[in-house]
Amino acid sequence: MTLTTVLLVAAVAWLSFANGANDNFKGVATLFGTATTTYTQAIWWAMVTTLAGALFAFYLGDALIKAFSGKGLVGPEVLADPSFIAAVAIAAASTVFLATRLGFPVSTTHAIVGGLVGAGLMAPGQVAFSLLGERFLLPLLIAPFAAIALTLALYTVFRRIRLWLGVSRETCLCIGEKEHVVAVESPVMMVAQGTGSEMVLKSATGHAELRPGIELRVGDEASCKQRYNGHLIGINADSLVNVLHFISAGSVGFARGLQDTAKIVGLLVGASLIGLTDRSSLLWGVAIVAVLTALGGLLSARRVAETLGHKITDMNQGQGFTANLVTSTLVISSALWGWGVSTTHCSVGALFGVGVASGTARWAMIAQIVMAWLITLPVAALLAVAAYLIIS
């Protein structure tokens, strides 16, 4: 095994870890954001479901693995050079890792495509730009808008169904103690100061005290959660929505594992380190990528989790369920068709849709995230150019 091949394997391992750190929480962000679970509970659920989806990539991900191997995008003589795939993996991993440290949810798919373009431009031969647009860029552009539109539509439908069934939404009133500084009037007292002939009398008419009082708050305190009041098919509506919300979050984790594992394994296939026809080596590749992705999520997802759960929009569990349903549907269906959509664009786009529908979108943060999306591909491309020149 050459030094370049060792570097390639290390870069793919780093990309797997960075992908988990940035992407694993995207399915369970709604659980965390609605206080349905704690951060720890959410990240473990994300790990379990992502691992399950990653292992299914062995059975269902052949189309995506082939698409992201680079075959057809660049010539076979380029793919035969391990420097090419190593540069792609280094660029994608660096881009995603930097975004994770800054707390921005970005697209690993964008980063990989940027790496393929940058390294492809420097390598001998030509990049098939028509295939690049059809296979990669078009799905990436459509996905966030599709997620927003579907979320708005489903939110409206589900809300009308809820009202038709007589299920109301309750917001609690928080009542708690709070100490206040108050001025207390007291009887006039004559206070002697000084000694002997210098003694004078001064009056004291009051003092300040801390006294407990009652404070009332309505709305978004941690102890106040919106709940659904009523029954659906004989089941408590709030309990049913919570269960469906939890399952939908798991479905996004599964879909993400299926999509992104196949994309990363595709780099190993492109470098001919493993093959689609050699199912034994392919299984090992899928398993290693899956484990490293899970570790990345467990160890380094906190900053992205705060952004996704608390900084994009306020939401309740019903809205979280809607966002997750849209995300998982888009990601799983596109994976089966071999379209490389971004789980990030789908999940965050769905959260944008929730914010627009409920009127609680935080536009300053949304603008920052969109800007991070726009620069992901060119940054990865530039890093791939530099990495390819250094390695080769």
Q: What are the language-model segments listed below?
A:
Residues 21-28, 36, 102-114, 259-267, ...:
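Short, non-helical or kinked segments that cap or interrupt transmembrane helices
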Residues 101-104, 309-343, 359, 369-373:
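Hydrophobic alpha-helical bundle architecture
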Residues 159-248:
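Intrinsically disordered, low-complexity non-transmembrane regions of multi-pass membrane transporters
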Residues 1-6, 74-80, 122-135, 270-284, ...:
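Helix-coil boundary and interhelical linker segments in multi-pass alpha-helical membrane proteins
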Residues 248-323:
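Transmembrane helical segments that form the transport core of multi-pass membrane transport proteins
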Residues 8-15, 45-53, 57, 61, ...:
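Alpha-helical transmembrane segments in multi-pass membrane proteins
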Residues 35-48, 135, 278-283, 317-322, ...:
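Membrane-interface alpha-helices at helix entry/exit sites of multi-pass transporters
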Residues 30-39, 113-127, 267-278, 348-360:
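Interfacial segments of multi-pass membrane proteins
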